[in-house]
């Protein structure tokens, strides 16, 4: 009987250790804020002596980004460019729209998976298994095992690996001496089974380039209030570095 109790205590201790190790490992590895930014396409601009830029920054996400345009303007100025309020007086146009800024699985934004931990599941399974070693008090032992599993779940709940992603579409236009002809084609839906094709042609003096910027902020128990400024800084830096 004494041996069975010792075995039960040992298994419960192991359960608690297993349930907590995953959470502890995540807390240690993700204790510092990590920020990564990627661009879907490289934009090559022709070298020019003109250094005037017009900014048009939009935000259609559900997050407040009221200070983003100011950060982008500061980053552009730091590169030696002048930000102007009139598009007609600017050599470059930078247009950007924040599509989404929210919690997101890294597989969706970066294509790689941050493996999680399974402490709580192991704790519950091992706890139930203790019953086989104490047939005289199966109910009580099962209760101890389930309690150990719940402790593991509580430990896991306190440690969450959080990733915030900001997705931004960017269009940059640069003036050119050549005449640029642009053909626009749009498919407009008509009900559920049809579409109307709309085409137009225009001429101008700008080459336009498009890219998408994806920024990730990753940390244990990360809140958006902490992620927001670094995500904005990374976006501003990436846009300014195109010039």
Curated annotation (Swiss-Prot):
Lipid-anchored residues (S-diacylglycerol cysteine): 21
Domain of life the protein comes from: Bacteria
Membrane topology: Lipid-anchor
Lipidated residues (N-palmitoyl cysteine): 21
Keywords tagged on the record: Cell outer membrane, Conjugation, Lipoprotein, Membrane, Palmitate, Plasmid, Signal
Record bears the keyword Membrane: yes
PROSITE patterns referenced in this protein's UniProt entry, alphabetically: PROKAR_LIPOPROTEIN
InterPro entries per the UniProt record, alphabetical: TraT_complement-R
Coiled-coil segments: none
Record flagged with keyword Signal: yes
Principal localisation: membrane
Signal peptide: 1-20
GO cellular component labels: cell outer membrane
Cell compartment(s), UniProt: Cell outer membrane
A Pfam family matched in the record: TraT
Free-text function comment from the UniProt entry: Responsible for preventing unproductive conjugation between bacteria carrying like plasmids.
NCBIfam families the UniProt entry points to: PRK13731.1
Record family assignment: Belongs to the TraT lipoprotein family.
Protein name per the record: TraT complement resistance protein
Protein's organism: Escherichia coli
């Amino acid at each position: 009987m004494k041996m069975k109790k010792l075995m039960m205590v040992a298994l419960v201790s192991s359960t608690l250790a297993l349930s907590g190790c995953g959470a502890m490992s995540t807390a240690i590895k993700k204790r510092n804020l990590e920020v990564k930014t990627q661009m879907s396409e490289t934009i090559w601009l022709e070298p020019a002596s003109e250094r005037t830029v017009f900014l048009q920054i939009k935000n259609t996400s559900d997050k407040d980004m009221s200070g983003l345009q100011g950060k982008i303007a500061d980053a552009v100025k730091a590169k030696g460019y002048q930000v102007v309020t009139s598009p007609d007086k600017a050599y470059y146009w930078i247009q950007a729209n924040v599509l989404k800024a929210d919690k997101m699985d890294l597989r969706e934004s970066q294509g790689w998976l941050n493996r999680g931990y399974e402490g709580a599941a192991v704790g519950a399974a091992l706890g139930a298994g203790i019953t086989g070693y104490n047939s005289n008090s199966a109910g009580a032992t099962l209760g101890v095992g389930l309690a150990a599993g719940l402790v593991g779940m509580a430990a896991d709940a306190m440690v969450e690996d959080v990733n915030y992603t900001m997705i931004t579409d960017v269009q940059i236009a640069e003036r050119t001496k050549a005449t640029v002809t642009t053909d626009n084609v749009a498919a407009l839906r008509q009900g559920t089974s049809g579409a109307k094709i709309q085409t137009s042609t225009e001429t101008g003096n700008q080459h336009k380039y498009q890219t998408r910027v994806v920024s990730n902020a990753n940390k244990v128990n990360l809140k958006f209030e902490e992620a927001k400024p670094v995500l904005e800084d990374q976006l501003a830096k990436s846009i300014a570095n195109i010039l």
